[in-house]
């Protein structure tokens, strides 16, 4: 059947906050402050870990990588969103949309696999403490991070390629503030069955597999902790895992809510506001949860602050 009066989509128009036109300046101020706070907080965490040699161990190495990924993650989306909030023309080229989706997926998927790596690190620290420095040497840590990034890159490349090989001849108005999977699929012609396949792939590869690895790690961790002779030892061992468990719960909870819930339950504006939780708020709080609960990190930060003040 021939297409009539259909043109290929060359650019995408963002309509994420179009129903909140009167609040866009306020949203700009709020999101800008959150973005700057996210950058500042994560930069402080990275700097503290780099400057204090006592923190040059695998757990803090992975925390620094996590903070770095959070900075990149927000940089992919937030600056463009801030510009659009103050602009009349809220557009992105079709190629730019594809690049944004790939970058977002790459960092998000890598983040999921990195959380699995951090779970494995906790497993080695608690279940094999005497061999921890050998099993989690610098080369091993670098290899695990590289593997997490490789998995993220592969998943992002496959999904982005599949999505943008679809025919885009319909509307170019995207009811979102960045090129996320579900909103972009709605622009594609004949996407219904394909969208289900893509979302299933995303959930299986990025949510189920890393989460399963984390659960396996914590089954072994819990088994080892229960064998500790003293209650104090059990509490101390488990306290090192609490921050990681909180981040895992927040990350997978947000991702599951966004990608597994029925799409028809919320309006486009509600979808956009919900997405803010994992594009701005989560990257702000994740590293803070990990660092502020940790006495070693707080001690190192205070030491660096005192040293800096003494030099002024």
From Swiss-Prot:
What InterPro entries does this protein's entry cite?
GPCR_Rhodpsn (IPR000276), GPCR_Rhodpsn_7TM (IPR017452), Olfact_rcpt (IPR000725)
> Which is one Pfam family of this protein?
7tm_4
Q: Which GO terms describe its biological process?
A: detection of chemical stimulus involved in sensory perception of smell
Record keywords: Transmembrane included?
yes
Indicate the principal place this protein occupies in or around the cell: membrane
Subcellular localization, as worded in the UniProt entry: Cell membrane
Topological type in the membrane: Multi-pass membrane protein
| Gene Ontology MF, one | olfactory receptor activity
Report what the protein is called: Olfactory receptor 10K2
At the highest ranks, the source species' classification is: Eukaryota, Metazoa, Chordata, Craniata, Vertebrata
Gene field: OR10K2
